[in-house]
Amino acid sequence: MNATDSTFMGLLQAQVRNEFSASQQYIAVAVWFDAKDLPQLAAHFYRQSVEERNHAMMLVQYLLD
């Protein structure tokens, strides 16, 4: 593995962390809206969380393949 490959892999790993972090943040917001009895807003943020998790998992699959 050369320096360019190593840099690219590092950037991909950082993006995986960013995507999972965003997913967790969306869950936190969704839970807050759930606690405030705002189910439509909560549902929106739960969906966003799943979307971010799916982004992370696509990158993980790329790294594993």
Predicted regions and their residues:
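Iron-associated oxidoreductase/ferritin-like identity signal
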Residues: 1-65
